Amino acid sequence: MHLEHDRPLGGGGAPAASGGAGPRWQSPPGTPAGPAPTDRALRVGVGGPVGSGKTALVAALCRALAGRIRLGVVTNDIYTTEDADFLRSAGVLDPGRIRAVETGCCPHTAIRDDITANLDAVEDLESDLGRLDLILVESGGDNLTATFSYGLVDRQIFVIDVAGGDKVPRKGGPGVAGSDLLVVNKTDLAPLVGADLAVMARDAAAMRGGRADRPVLFTSLRSDAGASDVADWVLAQLPSPARPQ
């Protein structure tokens, strides 16, 4: 059973007719994030290309935050439950706090165009576990055009990496330009691929309009400590009563 959502979507997004076919919610790229909710868990989407390190980031965030706040995870894969299985086997959370969505379609469809399956998973988590502070929703691997509907998440993290060289940020796209947080991962590979991190920082800032409210963080997730700045950013998004003291 679906819950009511008090976050209207900018740009005229609207729910599909009850019982009708088609997407439940739609939101255009660039729809601004609103204030953090106080009546349910904050939902943070984690998107990015295949292999950029989304699952590694989610795992590191779970390890960093599990003892401090109440959280759950929803993963997306096209045909398998691979990412959820990895998180469970790694022991980053109690297995009951991790749910998997098999989209059977392009990853962006399930996080932007028809978010019903993901909303069901999110709402089932909250129904089964009670009040949570945070739910991380990991997208399946997609390209630079992938964005989440703000009917599904309250904040968006977009993960790219340096393996493709320092040109990736200036290729732009909604994820690079419009996400609430851009993470440039695998910085330890920069010398091996000839990527200039200063160039990536400059180009990423330019693509994001130099806005202080849309930061860029550089990470290497070879150890969980590499996600500490991202964890701090996530905690800062929580409404004040939910933030650990």
From Swiss-Prot:
GO molecular function: GTP binding; GTPase activity; nickel cation binding
Region of interest called Disordered, as start-end residue ranges on this chain: 1-43
A single Gene Ontology CC term: cytoplasm
Coiled coil: none
Gene3D superfamilies referenced in this protein's UniProt entry, alphabetically: P-loop containing nucleotide triphosphate hydrolases
Domain of life of the source: Bacteria
Main location: cytoplasm
Biased composition (Gly residues): 9-22
Entry binding sites for GTP: G48, P49, V50, G51, S52, G53, K54, T55
Cysteine-cysteine disulfides: none
Cellular compartments annotated: Cytoplasm
Keyword annotations of the record: Chaperone, Cytoplasm, GTP-binding, Nickel insertion, Nucleotide-binding
Pfam families (alphabetical): cobW (PF02492)
GO BP: any one term: urea catabolic process
Subunit annotation: Homodimer. UreD, UreF and UreG form a complex that acts as a GTP-hydrolysis-dependent molecular chaperone, activating the urease apoprotein by helping to assemble the nickel containing metallocenter of UreC. The UreE protein probably delivers the nickel.
Similarity comment: family membership: Belongs to the SIMIBI class G3E GTPase family. UreG subfamily.
Role played: Facilitates the functional incorporation of the urease nickel metallocenter. This process requires GTP hydrolysis, probably effectuated by UreG.
Protein name: Urease accessory protein UreG
Organism in which the protein naturally occurs: Parafrankia sp. (strain EAN1pec)
